[in-house]
């Protein structure tokens, strides 16, 4: 068995966060939180002022990240978080900011 053991149930979720989430360090804080939870994927700004992310990892860590995204860093004001599971065979290598 590998030390990585990514064969446990890995889930992938697409997330959209709306509110005051650009220009406040939201993506940087999201990367830090994702690294702390050992999640993989990415986070990016969208032209409409929202932030999108792809989260990949075990369900308990995904749930913790979704809970964190509902408020984000203290500099942000989150008004809405939507998410949906996106089953995929693709495995991200790390979590990064786009």
Curated annotation (Swiss-Prot):
The keyword Lipid metabolism does not apply. Residues 12-98 form the Acylphosphatase-like domain. Disulfide bonds: none annotated. Keywords: Hydrolase. Its EC number is 3.6.1.7. It catalyses: an acyl phosphate + H2O = a carboxylate + phosphate + H(+). It holds the Pfam family Acylphosphatase. The active site is at 27, 45. It comes from the Bacteria. One of its GO terms (molecular function) is acylphosphatase activity. InterPro entries: Acylphosphatase, Acylphosphatase-like_dom, Acylphosphatase-like_dom_sf, Acylphosphatase_CS. Coiled coil: none annotated. Belongs to the acylphosphatase family. This is Acylphosphatase. It comes from Burkholderia thailandensis (strain ATCC 700388 / DSM 13276 / CCUG 48851 / CIP 106301 / E264). The gene is acyP.
